[in-house]
């Protein structure tokens, strides 16, 4: 059944039931047309035209034409004739001297009918004088009025309003420009000034539709241009820029139209819950999340293009039109470039096309002069043109190769040259591999940025290691980085570390090959190329070892040291690792990770200096820890006999797994503890190893770990590491390293409350009821398959279990309870959260103390999959 033109509807058909049916038919027609690939620009204009007809017909039905000096005006996006399925329909009822009861009643009836039809109507009733007065004091109203478009009623009245709005007295062009620039800056800051947000807003994110609107509003105010085409005809855009903006707008409109098809209520955020369905509407398909990632890659690239055009065109408008003749004097730098104020400028109009390698010269000059903080708008425009006309990548030009290598060696290039090269599309023009990762995202909560943005942020973090003010946050890297002789090798490794993402296969392996080829083609020696290639191949090695292995096990350190081989590679790797973690997600680096990386670095450095053929003697380590702890305890007034009597209850493993400070702390409180059968809970007053340490002494019970984990989870406290052991006489000696919900150590004020809360849960209970928090909204849109892998230990006496699952509240407690139910002993846990994924390591033994046999492993796997599934149901 086809919808009818609203103008053809009779008075008897203008009832809610009939109109709702017509609106449904029209909307369904548009959805079908969208899926049949009708141009979205036609659809949004068509939708606007449909509502023009509907409102005109209702205007006639309510006899507004009988009222003199009244007209119906479309404003805002509706005024631009741009309506998406859930767009607001903003109207202005313009009237002069019509405020009587009859008029007000008609307006009320019209608006009520539109609301009853579930339309998002924004309406105002004003005179011309009121419009001007309010608009002069309200930028949003002024902007909406500027887009006013006549629908029906008194046309002359609408014309008079337009004359007033477009007069110089109503928001002069320069004032309007500055107000819109300030408005855009505030809007961009709400989105962290980046086009790369995990759940971007199609309309308001930097590079979104609002950036195109800002250009059109400013051009409309100054030139009277009402479309991108008219902006081009007015000379504000070149033909190429006009076509590019039109192409970007068309894509963003298609994404927005598809999103509105999916939603029931107005929203422009491309949330995780809707990215997959929008991708499907747009025809982006692929295995797993490939369709979403392909769509988002195109989306981010489009935002990037719009943001670049927006920035350049607004600067051109400011300099060439508003402030023509007011520019700073040019200071000549060399034959090709000059500086004007704080901007660098090409001295010849076709410099980059004639000699493409001079593009690199510009960034070398920026690195040389810290007072230059940008590129002049005409030079940006020239660069964009030259970039598009290149018939080969810049890395294929020998002169450009030499200059790029100079940039990697320049001490100031990390500060702004590389980020500017990326922002202006030069890295993509230089490296073919880089052009493939621009906009490449991963559909998860772990990677906050696209691959290209992450890599640029990594370079910036490396630069921070040369600033001594960052020593507290990055003590090892700030100590090491200034001493690294060939920093360019680290920079090249940083550029290539993720460059093969999105290709399929192991990105570390593929990137290592690319990095080696790059180094050789740029004249580096084979040993240098091998080092860079190894760094790219191994860039995850240190973080994985620190976070998912027991780095206090000498065997783990020996194995890691064998892969690193020497201190030079260790120094390069730790700088790359820390910068990589910091650049992945702003919330990822914390005191706990800093402590883990530092402990792994220091232990590996000691192993390399001692020689891998000389492993440490574990008995010496036990004696050392006992001697140091004993001295501390004697200074507190305890006798050696008391200390020895306590320690005779402990197994040798206890003295290996704890530092002498931890051992002394535990003993000091246990020796004062009057009733040894009563539980004791300690919380460290000072942050230890980057977190808060909780020590639990209690009669050992199967569910003890699960009980503590469940209670901590309920309090939004995260366990990062756990040592689970028992004394010879059956008492638990469990240590939990924890952080609060902000990834900070537990503050002192909260510590006593937490101790009381843990005592209240009755640690000696045989079973625990796991109460879980509500999972975050974003988790609902991810499906991480629960899986585990069992690995033997070097001695063969224990089993390592690598465990992966959706990081649902209550997960760790559920895992612990499952161990207890099956009679499996837990000895240690390393807890790692990677976005929506939990990737944990557990060290286990059977109920008789040996490794888990195949049958027990199978039983555990079935039970864990079943119990974890219950958490999400």
Curated annotation (Swiss-Prot):
The species this protein was found in: Aliivibrio fischeri (strain MJ11)
Coiled coil regions in record: none
Family: Belongs to the GlnD family.
SMART domains assigned to the protein according to its UniProt record, in alphabetical order: HDc
Reaction catalyzed: [protein-PII]-L-tyrosine + UTP = [protein-PII]-uridylyl-L-tyrosine + diphosphate; [protein-PII]-uridylyl-L-tyrosine + H2O = [protein-PII]-L-tyrosine + UMP + H(+)
Cross-referenced PROSITE patterns: ACT (PS51671), HD (PS51831)
Residue segments, region Uridylyltransferase: 1-332
Name of the protein in question: Bifunctional uridylyltransferase/uridylyl-removing enzyme
Enzyme Commission code(s) on record: 2.7.7.59, 3.1.4.-
One Pfam family linked to the record: NTP_transf_2
InterPro entries: ACT-like_dom_sf, ACT_dom, HD/PDEase_dom, HD_domain, NT_sf, PII_UdlTrfase/GS_AdlTrfase, Polymerase_NTP_transf_dom, UTase/UR
Function: Modifies, by uridylylation and deuridylylation, the PII regulatory proteins (GlnB and homologs), in response to the nitrogen status of the cell that GlnD senses through the glutamine level. Under low glutamine levels, catalyzes the conversion of the PII proteins and UTP to PII-UMP and PPi, while under higher glutamine levels, GlnD hydrolyzes PII-UMP to PII and UMP (deuridylylation). Thus, controls uridylylation state and activity of the PII proteins, and plays an important role in the regulation of nitrogen assimilation and metabolism.
Record comment: activity regulation: Uridylyltransferase (UTase) activity is inhibited by glutamine, while glutamine activates uridylyl-removing (UR) activity.
Listed HAMAP family: PII_uridylyl_transf (MF_00277)
Every HD domain range: 451-573
Superkingdom assignment: Bacteria
GO molecular function: [protein-PII] uridylyltransferase activity; phosphoric diester hydrolase activity
């Amino acid at each position: 059944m086809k919808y009818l033109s609203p103008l053809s509807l009779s008075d008897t058909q203008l009832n809610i039931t009939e109109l709702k049916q017509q609106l449904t038919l029209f909307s369904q027609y548009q959805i079908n047309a969208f899926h049949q690939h009708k141009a979205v620009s036609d659809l949004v204009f068509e939708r606007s035209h449909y509502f023009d007809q509907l409102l005109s017909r209702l205007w006639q039905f309510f006899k507004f034409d009988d009222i003199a000096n009244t007209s119906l005006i479309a404003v805002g996006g509706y005024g631009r004739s741009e309506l998406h399925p859930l767009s607001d329909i903003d109207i202005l009822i313009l009237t002069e001297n019509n405020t009587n009861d009859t008029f007000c009643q008609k307006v009320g009836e019209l608006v009520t009918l539109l609301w009853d039809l579930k339309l998002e109507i924004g309406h105002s009733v004003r005179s011309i004088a009121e419009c001007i007065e309010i608009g002069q004091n309200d930028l949003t109203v002024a902007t909406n009025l500027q887009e006013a478009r006549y629908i029906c009623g008194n046309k002359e009245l609408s014309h008079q309003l337009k004359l007033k709005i477009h007069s110089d007295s109503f928001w002069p062009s320069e004032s309007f420009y500055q107000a819109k620039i300030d408005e855009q800056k505030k809007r961009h800051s709400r989105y962290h000034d980046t086009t790369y947000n995990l759940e971007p807003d199609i309309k308001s994110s930097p590079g979104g539709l609002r950036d195109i609107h800002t250009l059109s509003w400013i051009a409309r105010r100054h030139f009277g241009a009402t479309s991108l085409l008219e902006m081009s005809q007015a000379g504000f855009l070149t033909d190429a820029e006009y076509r590019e903006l039109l192409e970007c707008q068309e894509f963003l409109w298609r994404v927005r139209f598809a999103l509105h098809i999916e939603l029931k209520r107005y929203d422009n955020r491309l949330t995780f819950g809707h990215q997959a369905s929008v991708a499907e509407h747009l025809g982006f398909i692929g295995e797993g999340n490939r369709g979403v990632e392909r769509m988002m890659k195109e989306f981010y690239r489009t935002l990037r293009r719009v943001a670049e055009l927006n920035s350049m065109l607004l600067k051109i408008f400011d300099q060439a039109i508003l402030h023509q003749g007011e520019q700073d004097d040019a200071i000549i730098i060399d034959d090709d470039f000059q500086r004007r104020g704080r901007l660098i400028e090409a001295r010849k109009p076709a410099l980059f096309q004639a000699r493409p390698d001079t593009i690199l010269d510009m960034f070398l000059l920026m690195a040389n002069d810290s007072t230059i903080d940008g590129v002049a708008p005409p030079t940006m425009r020239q660069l964009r043109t030259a970039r598009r006309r290149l018939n080969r990548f810049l890395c294929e030009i020998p002169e450009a190769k030499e200059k790029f290598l100079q940039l990697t060696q320049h001490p100031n290039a990390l500060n702004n040259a590389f980020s500017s090269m990326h922002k202006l599309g030069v890295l993509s023009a230089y490296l073919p591999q880089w052009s493939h990762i621009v906009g490449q995202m991963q559909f998860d909560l772990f990677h906050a940025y696209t691959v290209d943005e992450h890599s640029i942020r990594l370079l910036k973090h490396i630069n921070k290691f040369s600033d001594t003010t960052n020593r507290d946050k990055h003590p090892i890297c700030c100590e090491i980085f200034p001493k690294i002789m060939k920093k360019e090798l680290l920079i090249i490794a940083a550029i290539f570390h993720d460059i093969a993402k999105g290709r399929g296969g192991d990105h570390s392996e593929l990137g290592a090959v690319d990095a080696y080829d790059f180094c050789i083609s740029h004249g580096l020696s084979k040993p240098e190329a091998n080092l860079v290639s190894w760094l790219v191949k191994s860039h995850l090695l240190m973080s994985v070892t620190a976070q998912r292995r027991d780095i206090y096990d000498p065997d783990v350190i020996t194995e890691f040291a064998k892969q690193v081989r020497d201190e030079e590679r260790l120094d390069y790797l730790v700088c790359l690792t820390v910068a990589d973690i910091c650049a992945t997600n702003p919330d990822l680096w914390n005191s706990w990770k800093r402590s883990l990386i530092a402990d792994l670095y220091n232990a590996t450095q000691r192993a390399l200096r001692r020689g891998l053929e000389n492993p440490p003697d574990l008995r010496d380590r036990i004696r050392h820890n006992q001697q140091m702890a004993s001295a501390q305890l004697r200074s507190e007034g305890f006798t050696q006999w008391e200390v020895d009597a306590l320690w005779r209850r402990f197994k040798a493993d206890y003295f290996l797994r704890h530092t002498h400070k931890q051992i002394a702390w535990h003993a000091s409180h246990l020796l004062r503890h009057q009733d040894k059968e009563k539980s004791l809970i300690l919380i460290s007053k000072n942050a230890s190893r980057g977190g808060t340490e909780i020590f639990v002494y209690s009669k050992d019970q199967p569910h003890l770990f699960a009980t503590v984990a469940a209670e901590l989870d309920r309090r939004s406290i995260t366990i990062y590491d756990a040592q689970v052991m028992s004394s010879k006489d059956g008492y638990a000696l469990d240590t939990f390293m924890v952080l609060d919900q902000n990834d900070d150590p537990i503050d002192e004020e909260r510590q006593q409350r937490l101790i009381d809360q843990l005592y209240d849960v009755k640690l000696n209970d045989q079973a625990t009821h796991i109460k879980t928090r509500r999972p975050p909204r974003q988790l609902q849109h991810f499906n991480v398959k629960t899986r585990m892998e069992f690995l033997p230990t070097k001695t063969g006496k224990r089993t390592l279990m690598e465990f992966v699952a959706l990081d649902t509240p209550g997960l760790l407690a559920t895992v612990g309870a499952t161990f207890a139910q099956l009679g499996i002993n837990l000895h240690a846990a390393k807890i790692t959260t990677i976005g929506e994924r939990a990737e944990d390591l557990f060290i286990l033994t059977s109920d008789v103390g040996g490794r888990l046999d195949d049958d027990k492993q199978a039983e555990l796997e079935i039970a864990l999959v079943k119990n974890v599934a219950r958490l999400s149901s």
